[in-house]
Amino acid sequence: KSNIKKIYNSVMTRADLIIAGSNFIFSHIKKNYSKYLNEKKKLMVIFRGINVDYFDPTTKIEIDEKKLLKKWDIEKDKKIILLPGRLTSWKGQEVFIEAINLVNIELGYEAFYAVILGSDQGRDLYKKKLIRLSEQYRLSKQIRFIDHCKDMALAYKVSDIIVSASTEPEAF
């Protein structure tokens, strides 16, 4: 990072209390901004929480599930494997597609649907690369690329397996 960027980012260390959302962020702050910290400043980790009411599967109704599956062009006759996260190389979408191909070799093709759910945020070249990879493995009928979902709790509920395939440490 440039010196200007480091100085700009150091503004956060001027507070009396600095809260990091993960051990990764805590270590990053200590490593990169230690010269801005002193013994009077307190640095601590408070992990992000989740709203358990929002993710309560009993609050979702079957008609909403059917609408979502129709929107995704999925019949619920097969299992659904979901990879949520914006489209970026370190989120592991390429690894996921390659893994789907390997699972297909073991289970037979089209035994399940795979949903890659997340915005490309203008990275259309990366999305095209993922689509080409899925075509190369002949997975076009099986993999769904979904740009956005307003109801992630519902997306999790209709899915049988949720995958995190990140290839680098997450900030949270």
Annotate each PLM feature.
Residues 2-18:
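Membrane-proximal helix-turn-helix segments that form the acceptor-binding/catalytic region
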Residues 15-45, 50-55:
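A short, active-site helix/loop in glycosyltransferases that binds the activated sugar's phosphate group
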Residues 16, 157-171:
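Acidic donor-binding loop of glycosyltransferase active sites
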Residues 21, 46-49, 83-87, 117-118, ...:
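Short hydrophobic "strand-cap" motifs at the C-terminus of beta-strands
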Residues 34, 56-74, 130-131:
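A short helix/loop element that forms part of the nucleotide-sugar donor recognition site in Leloir-type
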Residues 50, 84, 113-129:
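Glycosyltransferase donor-sugar binding loop
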Residues 79-105, 128, 170:
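A conserved mid-protein helix/loop that constitutes part of the nucleotide-sugar donor-binding site
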Residues 122-129, 139-149, 155:
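Active-site donor-binding acidic/aromatic loop of nucleotide-activated sugar
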